[in-house]
C-alpha cells in the first residue's frame, strides 16, 4: 500500500497537506542531504567551545564552562523552537525589516514550504539555523567566566537570544531584513554570530567586573590554562565544525559550498601561523600551542562573513590580517583593564568586524555565481570596483554593534537589580570555585575523598578542601615566579591569548 499523492505543493503555510501532497518533489534531495549533515556538523562546535573554554580556565571552574556550553545549546534550541525562528525568519515581517512576527510560534506551520531565504524546506532551514543560535549563545557566555551565577546566566541567555540575536539575524539573513535590502553582505555570521557574541560577552564581563585576585588586586588577573590538551581538542572540534558552518551556509550542494570550505581552511591555517609567529618573537622565542589555537580560531572568525563571496587567494590575507588584529586586541583588552578572561571580545568581537570589512573589499561577483541558479547576483566589493560595498559593511557593523551593546547593557543591569537574579557569585563562592559552589561536581576528583554514592544523590561529589594557595598564576604573579629565569617565563607567557 502506498500514499496516493494527488495534491500540488502550495509554497505557503506548511507547503501542503502531507497526506495528499508529496512535499519533497519541490526540493533537490542532494541539497537537503548536505544541509542535514551540515546541521549535525555545526552542533559539534558546541562541545568544542566547552572544551576550549574549560581548558583555558582554572581547575576549580573547569566543569562549569563545560556545563555552560551544553546548557547554552539546550536553552537556545528551546528558544529557537519557542519563538526564535519565527522572530528571525518569519516569511512576513510586515514590511519593517527589523524583526519577524510570531508566524512560526512553537514551530507552527514549519514543515514543507520553501524557507524565506533559500530553496530548502522551512523545517530543514530551521534546524540548520538553530545550530547557529546555539553556537552564538555558547560563545557569548565566555565573557562571564569564573564569576557568574548559573541560574541568572540561563535567564539572561534566553532573553538575550530573543532581543539581541533574533533581530540582528532578521536584519542580515531574512529576505526582508533591512541590511539585506541595503546590500550588506554576511555569508555565515560575521555580524550575527561573532560581532554579537563578542560584544555581548564584553558587556557581560564589564558589568560583572574583574575576577577577585588577592595577588593582583590593582592589576588584571592572569591565569595559565589548566589544560592545554582540552584547548587543542576544543579547537579541533571547532575547526571541524566550521567547515560545515561555512560550507552549509551556501544553502545547497553547489560549487560555492566546496569553495567556501577551502577558503575556510586556508584562513584558519594562515591565522594560526600568523598568531604563533607574532608570539614567538614577542615572547621569548618559544612556540605557543594556545597561541596557535587562538590564531586558528581568529582566522575562522575572519573568513566567516566572507567565505562564499571572496576568491580563495584572499583567504590568505583575511587569515593573516584577522590573526594579527585579534592578537593585538588581546593586548588592548589588558590596557583597557577589561577582564574578558576567555578573549570572547578580542577574537569574536574584533575578528567579526575585521572580517566584515574585508568582505567589502574582496567580495567577487564570480565567486557568488558559483551557486548557479540558487543565488541572486551581487555587485561584489572593491575588486569589482564596487566601492560602496565597504560602506554597506560599515553600516552593518555600526548597527549591530550599537544594538548589541545597548540592549545587552540594559538587560544585564535590569537583571542585576532584581535580588534573585544577581549576576555575580559572592567572594567566598568565587574563591571556592564555580564547580563546587554552583554545581557540586568537579572535573577532577583527585583532591577529594571517594565515597560511593548513588548516581542521583543530592551531592554527587565530595567538597574539596579550601584552597590554601592561589592556583594557576602566570609568570609575575607570585614571588617565586619573580625569581624565575627568562626561559622559564617564556614557557608561560601570553597564555591569556584565548578565544
UniProtKB/Swiss-Prot annotation:
Q: Where is the composition biased (Polar residues)?
A: 483-493
Glycoprotein in keyword set: yes
Primary localisation category? membrane
Autoinhibitory domain: annotated span? 450-485
InterPro entries recorded for this chain?
A: Ammonium/urea_transptr (IPR029020), Ammonium_transpt (IPR001905), Ammonium_transpt_CS (IPR018047), NH4_transpt_AmtB-like_dom (IPR024041)
Cytoplasmic topological intervals:
53-62, 144-152, 209-230, 279-289, 339-346, 415-499
In Pfam terms, one family for this protein is: Ammonium_transp
Subcellular location as annotated = Cell membrane
The entry's comment on post-translational modification says:
Phosphorylated at Ser-457 by the TORC1 effector kinase NPR1 under nitrogen-limiting conditions which causes a conformational change in the C-terminal region (CTR) to form an open active conformation. Supplementation of nitrogen source leads to inactivation and instant Ser-457 dephosphorylation via plasma membrane PSR1 and PSR2 redundant phosphatases.
The outcome of changing residue 483 to Q is: Does not affect glycosylation
Q: Which residues carry this modification: Phosphoserine?
A: 457
Tell me, according to the record, the phenotype of the null mutant: Impairs filamentation induction.
> How is it placed in the membrane, per its record?
Multi-pass membrane protein
Consequence of substituting residue 194 to E: Leads to increased competence to acidify the submembrane pH while losing the signaling capability
Provide the residue span(s) of the region labelled Linker domain.
442-449
**Cell membrane in keyword set:** yes
Topological domains on the Extracellular side lie at: 1-31, 84-122, 174-187, 252-257, 313-315, 368-393
Residues annotated as glycosylated: 4
**What happens upon changing residue 252 to Q?**
Does not affect glycosylation
Against PROSITE patterns, the record matches this protein to:
AMMONIUM_TRANSP
The entry's function note states: Transporter for ammonium (both charged and uncharged NH3 and NH4) to use as a nitrogen source. The affinity of MEP2 is about twenty times higher than that of MEP1. MEP3 has the lowest affinity. Under ammonium limitation acts as an ammonium sensor, generating a signal that leads to pseudohyphal (filamentous) growth.
Protein family according to the UniProt entry: Belongs to the ammonia transporter channel (TC 1.A.11.2) family.
Q: What is known of its domains?
A: Within the cytoplasmic CTD, an enhancer domain, limited to residues 428-441, upregulates substrate translocation via the MEP2 hydrophobic core, while an autoinhibitory domain, comprised within the 450-485 region and including the NPR1-target serine Ser-457, counteracts the action of the enhancer domain. In between, a linker domain, limited to residues 442-449, appears required for optimal activity when the kinase is present but dispensable when the kinase integrity is altered.
Q: Supply the name of the protein.
A: Ammonium transporter MEP2
The lineage is:
Eukaryota, Fungi, Dikarya, Ascomycota, Saccharomycotina
Amino acid at each position: 500500500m502506498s500514499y496516493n499523492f494527488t495534491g500540488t505543493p502550495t509554497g505557503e503555510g506548511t507547503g501542503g497537506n502531507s497526506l495528499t501532497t508529496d512535499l519533497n518533489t519541490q526540493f533537490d534531495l542532494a541539497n537537503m542531504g548536505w544541509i542535514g549533515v551540515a546541521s549535525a556538523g555545526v552542533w559539534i562546535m558546541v562541545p568544542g567551545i566547552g572544551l576550549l573554554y574549560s581548558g583555558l580556565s582554572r581547575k576549580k571552574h573547569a566543569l562549569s564552562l563545560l556545563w555552560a556550553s551544553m546548557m547554552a545549546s539546550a536553552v537556545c534550541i528551546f528558544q529557537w523552537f519557542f519563538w526564535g525562528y519565527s522572530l528571525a525568519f518569519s516569511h512576513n515581517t510586515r514590511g519593517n525589516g527589523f524583526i519577524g512576527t510570531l508566524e512560526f510560534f512553537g514551530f507552527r506551520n514549519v514543515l514543507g514550504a520553501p524557507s524565506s531565504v533559500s530553496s530548502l524546506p522551512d523545517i530543514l532551514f530551521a534546524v540548520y539555523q538553530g545550530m547557529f543560535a546555539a553556537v552564538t549563545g555558547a560563545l557569548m557566555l565566555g565573557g562571564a567566566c569564573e564569576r557568574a551565577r548559573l541560574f541568572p546566566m540561563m535567564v539572561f541567555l534566553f532573553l538575550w537570544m530573543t532581543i539581541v540575536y533574533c533581530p540582528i539575524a532578521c536584519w542580515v539573513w531574512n529576505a526582508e531584513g533591512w541590511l539585506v535590502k541595503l546590500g550588506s553582505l554576511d555569508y555565515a555570521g560575521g555580524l550575527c554570530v561573532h560581532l554579537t557574541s563578542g560584544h555581548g560577552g564584553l558587556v557581560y564581563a564589564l558589568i560583572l567586573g574583574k575576577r577577585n585576585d588577592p595577588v593582583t588586586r590593582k592589576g588584571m588577573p592572569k591565569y595559565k590554562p589548566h589544560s592545554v590538551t582540552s584547548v587543542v581538542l576544543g579547537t579541533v572540534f571547532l575547526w571541524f565544525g566550521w567547515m560545515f558552518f561555512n560550507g552549509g551556509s551556501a544553502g545547497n550542494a553547489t560549487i560555492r559550498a566546496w569553495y567556501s570550505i577551502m577558503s575556510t581552511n586556508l584562513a584558519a591555517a594562515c591565522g594560526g601561523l600568523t598568531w604563533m609567529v607574532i608570539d614567538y618573537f614577542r615572547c621569548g622565542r618559544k612556540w605557543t600551542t594556545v597561541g596557535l589555537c587562538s590564531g586558528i580560531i581568529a582566522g575562522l572568525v575572519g573568513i566567516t562573513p566572507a567565505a562564499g563571496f571572496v576568491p580563495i587567494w584572499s583567504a590568505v590575507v583575511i587569515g593573516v590580517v584577522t590573526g594579527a588584529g585579534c592578537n593585538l586586541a588581546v593586548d588592548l583588552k589588558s590596557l583597557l583593564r577589561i577582564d574578558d578572561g576567555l578573549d570572547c571580545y578580542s577574537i569574536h568581537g574584533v575578528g567579526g568586524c575585521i572580517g566584515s570589512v574585508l568582505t567589502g573589499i574582496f567580495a567577487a561577483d564570480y565567486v557568488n555565481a558559483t551557486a548557479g541558479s540558487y543565488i541572486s547576483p551581487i555587485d561584489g566589493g572593491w575588486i569589482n570596483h564596487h566601492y560602496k560595498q565597504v560602506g554597506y559593511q560599515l553600516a552593518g557593523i555600526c548597527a549591530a554593534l550599537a544594538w548589541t551593546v545597548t540592549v545587552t547593557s540594559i538587560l544585564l543591569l535590569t537583571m542585576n537589580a532584581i535580588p534573585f537574579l544577581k549576576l555575580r557569585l559572592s567572594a567566598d563562592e568565587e574563591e571556592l570555585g564555580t564547580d563546587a559552589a554552583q554545581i557540586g561536581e568537579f572535573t577532577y576528583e583527585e583532591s577529594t575523598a571517594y565515597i560511593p554514592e548513588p548516581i542521583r544523590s543530592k551531592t554527587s561529589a565530595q567538597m574539596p578542601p579550601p584552597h590554601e594557595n592561589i592556583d594557576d598564576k602566570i609568570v609575575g604573579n607570585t614571588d617565586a615566579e619573580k625569581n624565575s629565569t627568562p626561559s622559564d617565563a617564556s614557557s608561560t607567557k601570553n597564555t591569556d591569548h584565548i578565544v
